[in-house]
Design a protein with these regions (language model features):
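Conserved beta-strand in the GNAT
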Residues: 55, 61-70, 192-202
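A short helix-loop-beta-strand connector motif used in the catalytic cores of GNAT acetyltransferases and
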Residues: 40-55, 175-187, 236-237
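Short amphipathic alpha-helix that is part of the acyltransferase structural core
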Residues: 1-41, 84, 137-176, 284-286
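Core nucleotidyl-transferase/polymerase catalytic module
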Residues: 48-49, 54-56, 69, 120-124, ...
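A broadly used, surface-exposed interaction patch
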Residues: 47-52, 61-95
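C-terminal functional modules
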Residues: 259-286
Length: 286
C-alpha cells in the first residue's frame, strides 16, 4: 500500500474532497458538498486554525477527510476558539488510518472542540478520545401554544430590522451572519432591551418541517418568548422547535427525548445549551 499522508486541506484539494464526501455520504450528493466547502472557503478562521480541515492522502489522492468549522466565539466577557469536527469519512481500505485525522485535528492548543452529530456506534470511540457529553437529548417544543396571555409588549423583528432599544453589537453580528447562511434570525424586543434568536429550518425524518434553535442568550429567554416566537415561525410553516436539553424544559409544551442528538465537547470551556452558533448546522446546513 502506498504511503499515507495526513495534512491540511488546501484550496486545490476541494474538487477531490467534494467527490470523496459525496461517495462517503451519498444521501447528500456532490452539490451539497460543493456548497459546504464554498461556505468554509468564505470564512475567516482564527489564526493558526485550518480553513477546511484535514485529509488523508494516498498516492496523490484523498482517501479520507474531516472538516473543521473554526470560529472565535464570545461567552459573556470571555472569548474562546471553537472548532466543530464534522463530516468524518475514510475509504474502507484505509480505515485503520482514520485516527490520524482525529489526532491531527485535536492537536491545536487552547481550542474547544465540538462533535455535535456523532453516529451512535461512534459514541464509545468519541469518549475514548477524551470527549465529554454536555447535552444528553433534545426537547421538541410547540412554542406557538405557549405564552398566550403573558407576553404583551413583546415585538418579534427580523434581524435586518435595527432595534430601537439596547442590544449587543456582537449579537447583531451573529444574527446577521447566520441570516446570510440561511438561518432565521430574530430579535425579541421588549421596552427595556432586545433578545437574539437564531433558528435553522430542518425536517424531522426528512418530512416534518421544524426549526432548530441555533443561538440564544439563554434557553430561559426562549421559554419566556416561546409564544411570540412560535407564532412567528408558523409563518414559515414550522410548528416545532428542537432545543438541546438535559431534561424536560419547564414552561414549554412538547416532548423530551433523552439520548437523541447528544452533543460532545473537548477542551477548556464547556459550551452552554442554546449555543450552536458557527457549527455544521448553521454553516453547512447538515
Amino acid at each position: 500500500m502506498p504511503a499515507i499522508r495526513c495534512r491540511q486541506i488546501a484550496e486545490s484539494d476541494v474538487p477531490g474532497i467534494t467527490g470523496l464526501l459525496a461517495r462517503g455520504f451519498p444521501s447528500r450528493g456532490a452539490q451539497f458538498w460543493e456548497n459546504a466547502l464554498a461556505q468554509l472557503a468564505a470564512r475567516q478562521p482564527p489564526a493558526g486554525l485550518p480553513q477546511y480541515g484535514y485529509l488523508l492522502e494516498s498516492d496523490g489522492r484523498p482517501v479520507g477527510a474531516i472538516l473543521l468549522i473554526c470560529a472565535q466565539v464570545h461567552t459573556g466577557d470571555t472569548s474562546v476558539r471553537r472548532c466543530n469536527l464534522s463530516s468524518w469519512y475514510v475509504e474502507p481500505a484505509f480505515r485503520s488510518y482514520a485516527a490520524l485525522l482525529i489526532s491531527r485535528s485535536l492537536g491545536h492548543k487552547d481550542v474547544t472542540f465540538l462533535n455535535i452529530s456523532p453516529a451512535p456506534h461512534t459514541w464509545p470511540i468519541i469518549e475514548a478520545q477524551g470527549f465529554s457529553r454536555y447535552s444528553y437529548g433534545v426537547f421538541v417544543a410547540m412554542p406557538a401554544l405557549g405564552g398566550l396571555f403573558g407576553t404583551s409588549g413583546v415585538t418579534v423583528l427580523d434581524a435586518r430590522m435595527p432595534p430601537t432599544v439596547a442590544f449587543d453589537p456582537r449579537e447583531q453580528d451573529i444574527l446577521a451572519q447566520h441570516a446570510d447562511l440561511g438561518c432565521i434570525s430574530l430579535w425579541c424586543v421588549t421596552p427595556e432591551r432586545t433578545y437574539p434568536f437564531v433558528f435553522r429550518p430542518r425536517r424531522v425524518k426528512k418530512l416534518l418541517p421544524c426549526a432548530q434553535l441555533i443561538y440564544c442568550r439563554d434557553v430561559g429567554d426562549f421559554v419566556r418568548f416561546a409564544g411570540p416566537i412560535g407564532r412567528r415561525l408558523l409563518r414559515h410553516r414550522m410548528p416545532f422547535v428542537v432545543v438541546d436539553a438535559n431534561a424536560p424544559i419547564p414552561g414549554l409544551i412538547g416532548l423530551y427525548r433523552r439520548g437523541s442528538m447528544p452533543r460532545y465537547f473537548k477542551g477548556p470551556q464547556q459550551p452552554r445549551l442554546g449555543d450552536l452558533a458557527y457549527t455544521e448546522y448553521a454553516v453547512l446546513g447538515v
